[in-house]
Amino acid sequence: QVAAIKDYVIPMCFKDNKADHYIGWDSLRTRINNILTSEKCKVNEDKLLGPFFISKNMLDEIKNNKEQIDELEAKDEASRTEKDNEALKDMHQKENNYIKAFESKVIMYLFEDVMKMRPENIFIGHHKKNGKMIFSEICKAFEQDGEGIFGIEDLENI
């Protein structure tokens, strides 16, 4: 089951009514965990993000949604039916819902439970941009900058 974790993706940055890009969930959580265990944060192992911190059901849903989007977007625009376009619109809305779920699950956990006294040590990218260290501002920044709020700039887009 852990081998399958490498196949899961997370949508990032909701721009132009769709996700700007996707990154691997395992890569992202590993990088966040590396930040959490760094000298600046020194978080205990029991507070790290496990492979299924985001539920397997949601990870499966996200993966299936992305596969359907890729399939429809591979079609020539002129050959897409009205039904295809409506389906794409719905799938892109789901991407936004997944981004919101990431905020309410992962970002909230990191902000409230893990780094409540020092949020600038995990939300490094947001802090460097002089962003306010309040939950709503961090979420807004996440919708614009995705993984960049953690100071992560080099994960492969999928």
Segments from the language model and where they lie:
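C-terminal regulatory/interaction module of P-loop NTP-utilizing enzymes
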Residues: 1-158
